[in-house]
Curated annotation (Swiss-Prot):
The UniProt record lists the keyword Acyltransferase: no
Gene Ontology BP terms: CENP-A containing chromatin assembly
Coiled coil stretches, renumbered: 1-37
Entry annotated with the keyword Coiled coil: yes
Record keywords: Centromere, Chromosome, Coiled coil, Nucleus
Subunit comment: Component of the CENPA-HI complex, at least composed of CENPH, CENPI, CENPK, CENPL, CENPM, CENPO and CENPP.
Domain of life: Eukaryota
Function: Component of the CENPA-HI complex, a centromeric complex involved in assembly of kinetochore proteins, mitotic progression and chromosome segregation.
Entry's Gene Ontology cellular component terms: chromosome, centromeric region; nucleus
Cellular localization per UniProt: Nucleus; Chromosome, Centromere
Pfam families, sorted: CENP-P (PF13096)
Principal cellular location given in the protein's record: nucleus
Full protein name: Centromere protein P
Length: 287
């Protein structure tokens, strides 16, 4: 084989190496920006990128390592959505300033955390130094459709003041997870005891009412609130509010007065679900 043939192969190899480097750089850009886009947008971009690449390079399979990394990115994104419950549905950004090593961009995000919708906007200041890039978030504004989630107002105000998006999303995820757990628990008892359990505010409400069809005027209200402390940690707070006819109140006043304290003791001993179940059984409300 003469030298001209070798030269052809060497030229072809060099071209392929340059294409691989170009694709790798493009992939790194996608990876860096992926956190600002919804999962649908990322998946659409990945598919479009794959289609364009295949059309441009028919007869040549894509580099296996790049294809594997793209598939890994898809799996990681899906895992994060399932793990955190946070799904970004829309994102937009606008460059407000770009001078020398300083860049200011305005971002708008909206999405859902479990069943809790949210939207926010902020400015991202990036300063390029010789060795690294420093970033800071300013003018953070958060809007959450609180509705029955009034306890979120102080949490949102603190997050806006601190400008810590990571802490905001982490604590919001924990809060939304507890709300989802409450919703599922209430629905479970409503399905198990349909003639006894009532959800006055629907499945997203913060309390249920237990009524005995055989005891008109007697009911127990289980209130399940969420407490968010200064650090953003969510703690469930449950209480029992009995309502009884006047005659029964006079006859068993001590027992009725002690009912909330007994319920709180059961919560500590057995946990939320078992405490509610035991309450139903103890007061003779089970069918």
């Amino acid at each position: 084989m003469d030298n001209s043939v070798y030269q052809v192969y060497e030229d072809e190899i060099q071209l392929l190496e340059e294409e691989i480097k170009l694709l790798s750089d493009k992939y790194e850009d996608i990876q860096q920006e992926s956190t600002f886009f919804s999962d649908e947008e990322v998946l659409m971009s990945v598919k479009l990128f794959q289609r364009e690449f295949l059309e441009e390079h028919k007869g040549h399979g894509p580099p296996l390592d790049l294809k594997a990394e793209l598939e890994s990115l898809q799996r990681d994104l899906s895992f994060l959505v399932k793990f955190t419950g946070i799904q970004i549905t829309s994102h937009s950004k606008k460059t407000l300033e770009k001078t020398g090593n300083r860049t200011v961009q305005k971002h708008r995000l909206s999405g859902n955390c479990q069943s809790l919708p949210f939207s926010l906007e902020f400015q991202l200041l990036e300063v390029q130094n010789k060795e690294n890039v420093s970033a800071a978030i300013t003018d953070l504004s958060i809007a959450i459709e609180s509705g029955q989630h009034s306890e979120l107002s102080k949490f949102v105000s603190r997050a806006e003041e601190n400008g810590n998006l990571l802490m905001f999303f982490r604590n919001l995820s924990s809060y939304a997870e507890w709300c989802e757990h409450r919703r599922c628990t209430f629905l479970h008892f409503k399905a198990k005891y349909p003639n006894i359990v009532t959800l006055p505010e629907g499945q997203e409400g913060d309390h249920i009412i237990l009524r005995n069809p055989q005891l008109p005027g007697f009911e127990l209200m289980i209130v399940w609130k969420m407490h968010i402390d200064e650090e953003g940690t969510t703690t469930p707070v449950l209480d029992l509010l009995p309502k009884v006819p006047q005659q029964a109140l006079e006859q068993k006043k001590a027992s009725i007065d002690n009912a909330p304290a007994c319920f709180r003791s059961m919560l500590l001993l057995f946990g939320i679900e078992t405490a509610i179940e035991n309450l139903i059984q103890v007061v003779g409300l089970e069918k």
